């Protein structure tokens, strides 16, 4: 039986690990990130992959840095025939890449060489793409640059956000892995080199990318809002206070109002002017210190009036 070490951390990785177990491989160990403090109370919380591994009685390693010699030895002592990674969050050192006889393969949530890096799902929506997918490739020491083994395309719906697209890609990635691993083991594959000239990158989201610039066209802001939902969430300001914007809808009507101006309130939210004479309807938001709410509840509370301007004054945390 093929001995596999799985490396992954967030929810995306869980169906991938589960597939390996269900397909009957001997998952001899799981490597994931350390437990981290979570929420307002900073409660130490295990990564989703750790919880899944423990449910199946699989040994778990949680190195802060997998590149350290002692951590490499721990992984190799498990004698893996194959290492499979999915959203692990660390680049593997050469000793690990060279260890297993079938190599190391990675399940990456984009159609490589596009969107290499840690936030491919976010960027596929932020950039307004109509499709993305999952690529399984051999791992090398360079970020997401190894030879590609298999791919699957996934359509991005107009209403998808990072959460819904994440779930689609996670399921697609698990299915693709189930089809790919037997071919990797048998050698029945023809890996394809990535075209470096077509490589693009999806680095982790920075704080400045979360702030809405109302001078941008409505389509771009619409993609920003859904491309940051459910994490880290786009924000603007109202009366000097930060306000998270969870969801919006495009508005067909043109406007000559200055970007950021509240044009009108509607039953299900507020219509805000954006760049190029466009506008957006904010349908779900979260004022500072309050719970997430529907736009209709915000309007009912008379929290905003036509003529108010979003995006001015305080733009810090």
Curated annotation (Swiss-Prot):
Alphabetical list of SUPFAM superfamilies matching this protein: FMT C-terminal domain-like, Formyltransferase
Record PROSITE patterns: GART (PS00373)
GO cellular component, one term: cytosol
Binding residue positions for (6S)-5,6,7,8-tetrahydrofolate: 110-113
Record key words, sorted: Protein biosynthesis, Transferase
UniProt cross-references to InterPro entries, sorted A to Z: Fmt, Formyl_trans_C, Formyl_trans_C_sf, Formyl_transf_N, Formyl_transf_N_sf, Formyl_transferase-like_C_sf, GART_AS, Met-tRNA-FMT_C
Region (Disordered): 292-317
GO MF terms held by the record: methionyl-tRNA formyltransferase activity
Reactions listed under catalytic activity: L-methionyl-tRNA(fMet) + (6R)-10-formyltetrahydrofolate = N-formyl-L-methionyl-tRNA(fMet) + (6S)-5,6,7,8-tetrahydrofolate + H(+)
Pfam families in the cross-refs: Formyl_trans_C, Formyl_trans_N
Organism superkingdom: Bacteria
The protein's Enzyme Commission number: 2.1.2.9
Region forming the signal peptide: none
Similarity field: Belongs to the Fmt family.
PANTHER family: METHIONYL-TRNA FORMYLTRANSFERASE (PTHR11138), METHIONYL-TRNA FORMYLTRANSFERASE, MITOCHONDRIAL (PTHR11138:SF5)
Function: Attaches a formyl group to the free amino group of methionyl-tRNA(fMet). The formyl group appears to play a dual role in the initiator identity of N-formylmethionyl-tRNA by promoting its recognition by IF2 and preventing the misappropriation of this tRNA by the elongation apparatus.
UniProt protein name: Methionyl-tRNA formyltransferase
